[in-house]
Amino acid sequence: MAKAAEQKQNPTVASAEAKLDIRDVVNTAITYGEDNRHGGGKRNDVAMFVLRAMCMAVSTVAVTLMVTARETSMTTLYGFEFQLHAVWSLSDSLIYLVVVSSATVLYSLIQLIISGTRLMRKSPVIPTRTQAWFCFVADQIIGYAMVSGGSAALGVTNMNRTGIRHMPLPNFCKSLGFFCDHLAGSIVFALFAFLLLAASSLLDVLHLSRHR
């Protein structure tokens, strides 16, 4: 009789132990997943901080190159010698690029300060879904403004290098090499800033998926 009772109790004990084991596995998996999300979030926060710093630096270089683009030189057309005076502020497209790049510098600086402060406090750089949406939309707007400014300035630079096909105008960049090089450099850095903003947008999407 004792053996029979013992055999009846064994399945119950085994079932209880199995339930405990399953709970332990589930709890361990949940803890592991949370740790992974936390670690991934920290890496994304650091990556976001680095991208903001790089974007601010690159945009600053773009502005600096553009506002220092000025040169006076001489050129010959139809046997006559003319003085050329090139300044970035004479073109609306170049002014637009400077304004957009300056706005990107200011935006990146604000985001950099916020990110750095939160990293020092060991809190999430983007703590809420609403802020993630705001950063995503802002990155998209600033990014497309940068690429539009770079495209507009590229047209001016290309015309300076090739002249105008329907008019016998020379390649002004042969005489204004310093000016054209600064324009080209500013455009390259502006487009690079756009790529950095696009990368920041991807991190914004990751934050949005995490805050579902």
From Swiss-Prot:
The chain crosses the membrane at residues 46-66, 94-114, 136-156, 183-203. Residues 1-45, 115-135, 204-212 are cytoplasmic. It comes from the Eukaryota. Residues 67-93, 157-182 are extracellular. Keywords: Cell membrane, Glycoprotein, Membrane, Transmembrane, Transmembrane helix. Disulfide bonds: none annotated. Glycans are attached at residue 160. GO terms for cellular component: plasma membrane. It is a multi-pass membrane protein. It is found in: Cell membrane. Belongs to the Casparian strip membrane proteins (CASP) family. Homodimer and heterodimers. This is CASP-like protein 3A1. It comes from Arabidopsis thaliana (Mouse-ear cress). The lineage of its organism: Eukaryota, Viridiplantae, Streptophyta, Embryophyta, Tracheophyta.
